[in-house]
Amino acid sequence: MSSQIALPDGRTLSYAQAGADAGPVVTVLDGPCSRGLGWALAPTARELGIRLLIPDRPGIHGSAAKPGRTMADWPADQLALLDALDIERTGVVTQSGGTGYGVAVAASAPQRLTALALLGGLAPMTSREARMDAGKQLRTAVFLARKAPFVLKAGLRQTFKKLPDSAIAQVPAADRPFLDDPLIRDIHLRTMREFLGNPDAAIEEIRVLARPWGIAPPPAGVIPTALWTGELDEAHPPAHARQVAELLGGDPPVTVVPGVGTFGLSRVFPDVLRFAVGR
């Protein structure tokens, strides 16, 4: 279920809430067009008494589009949401394409964050090293979003028409066993429908990933920060998490979870959420 607020510039921002009804707050920033990480974290958050705030970036769900936006624009939107909901401080948990947005908030308003937890960290895709280390699907999408968005849009539409089979077929081998869990399967299919069903927003999100972040990371040690990544993650492998840690001064610990890709990071959700709220 979505709610909305009006932003100072007149745009709307939509968001969902999950987890516990009361308690410390964690803001969840997932990859392009996705609330999936928030839904996946929700059962653990309820058990731990943690509220989850899941905001939608511009052009997604009920959030009004903002053409030409960059990651550096996001903190103002997130801070406006926190103010509207009378939330003084929040932990931040990101995944994949949400990495840079979380770093941007940490850099802009460190006093509003309890901690920054980065799952499946994605380094800036502006360097050749980052592009080559990324999975083939992500690397191709970034290239097409920059050079031939019409080709990418056609591909997204074709994949959407072939759901759910196309979504299952694209799941890496390390993650496929987790689809036996009805919750994970449902979240994955719902997320893919949202991503593929809104190709214009999806392409804009990928374009943002293809550009420089446009932010100066927070000084090392200002905000407690940690990274978790799956040993077998194909889209954003451990090399990306290490690049992000280096970008953040080299101090944040990188935990490589053995034998799993992205979905298998669910085993560390309790640790991630506790870290995010400073427990």
Residues covered by each model-derived region:
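Conserved acidic catalytic loop of the alpha/beta-hydrolase fold
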Residues: 73-91
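Conserved alpha/beta-hydrolase "acid-adjacent" motif
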Residues: 234-240
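Catalytic active-site module of serine/aspartate enzymes centered on a nucleophile-bearing elbow/loop
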Residues: 248-279
